[in-house]
Amino acid sequence: IVGDRPVVPREPILADVRDVFGMTEAGGHLWIATDRGLLRHVDGRYTQVSSAQGLPFDTIFQMVEDGHGHLWLTGNRGIVRVALDELEAAADGRLARLDAVRFGEADGMASSQCNGSSQPTAWRRDDGSLWFATARGVAVLGPDYLQRGNYAAPPVVIEDNPVSHALFGSIDYQFEN
């Protein structure tokens, strides 16, 4: 609304957007959370980053920058961490697929539903921790976790496979790194 009257979108990308949930400035640009993914506003123009580029979901309710080069997004299916430089590259058309990481109940959250009933649903505290409103409380990522920057799953070691002997006879497996 400009001057208390609706604004008719001039760009086709805006015509599909029904809901705007939040905005933040990150990397020197305005990012807008919508029901159609993220919109980046630069010099009066909008570009879209959505599931077509690798976001796990399109309806994004809020976002918060972590101070370590990532933007964290909230939605009905969890929290997503994505590198800000990747978002910029995807919005510019220089990157076809984001390396977005989704966190949810399997990662220890009581609920992956992070739409919140009021704003803000995501917040960065002065100590660097990130707080997210969920349907069953608050999920918090501490600054130590964020600074590690390694969110990969731990290595898996298979020590025994009792089924193999029953099905295939006496087969021994040797797994090495």
Language model segments and positions:
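Short acidic alpha-helical/loop segments enriched in Asp/Glu that coordinate divalent cations
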Residues: 9
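Surface-exposed loop/turn elements that mediate protein-protein interactions on large endomembrane-trafficking
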Residues: 1-2
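Repeat-blade elements of multi-bladed beta-propeller folds
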Residues: 25-27
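Surface-exposed extracellular loop regions of Gram-negative outer-membrane beta-barrel proteins
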Residues: 41-42
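Residue-level "micro-hotspots" composed of small/polar
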Residues: 12-21, 36, 47-177
